[in-house]
Amino acid sequence: MKRILYWLAVLMLLVGCSAQRGTATIPPENSAVVIAILDTGISSTAIDRERLLEGYNYVTNSEDTEDRINHGTAAASIIVGCESAGITGLAPEVLLLPLVVTDKVDGKVTGVTPKVLAQAIYDAVNIYGADIINVSLGIKKDVDAVRKAVEYAHKKGVLIISAVGNDGEDGAFYYPAAYDIVLGVGSHNEDGEVSEFSHQNGSADLLAPGEDIWMASRNGAVYGAKGTSYAAACVSAAAALLLTENPKMAPEQVQQALYTNAMDIGSPGWDMQSGWGILKLTAPQLQ
């Protein structure tokens, strides 16, 4: 029996709608929006291979981008869907580029290092031609190398969308989400309120569904989880829909379009807890 995430269905109604590292993976004639997924990899068992580009594993220094943890595959399924799990993606026509920045090695999950995170951002821009970089993770320190990589991507016209973190109201800043030029994403619940676990420190620009979410595991099964990681994937999908219809939009234009159309909650306008409000796109904004 197919399950379709309630919040993804809501958003869909609102919308209306291979190579080695160092070479271009996108055919010149292909106009599909490319989202780089800096995460744990993406399972080719769960996600349609036609939606996947060949990426790189910065942990093992190899081309093995299969997911051994689930996190990256879950985010990917929100964006492009997973047939075996019965999940309909928000932007099923985009291409996903798996860049592995954390992995399971010898049974242990490796942490994300600033060096690896920065390099993956540079490569997403320079080698793989990504339009959007989704970072559903982060580090708790403002590191010069990461900040410079983010600034470089922005100057090159690549939008970075990142989760703000799950440590609650008093949570410390997560980077890159805390950088001003990055679109930071927090989570809201079914009642349209900021999730208790979502950081409320001013780093969130938008809120998106992050609770009671059905997504795909690396084996292609459906499972439930929560977190700002998955809210970020929702926003990346929405941004990809905008770029599909308006491919020349600059990162700040995409951000402004999303902010302008957000459903404001809390204090009028931007506020520390919810940013500009809840992600909302309507058909006219996609024309």
For each predicted feature, which ranges?
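C-terminal motif of bacterial Sec signal peptides marking the signal peptidase cleavage site
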Residues: 15-16
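Subtilisin-like serine protease catalytic core
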Residues: 25-35, 40-54, 62-113, 179-181, ...
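Catalytic-core environment of secreted peptidases
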Residues: 187-229, 266
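Short acidic, glycine-rich surface-loop motifs adjacent to enzyme active sites
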Residues: 121-143
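C-terminal subdomain of the subtilisin-like protease fold in secreted/lumenal serine endopeptidases
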Residues: 130-135, 156, 181-184, 196, ...
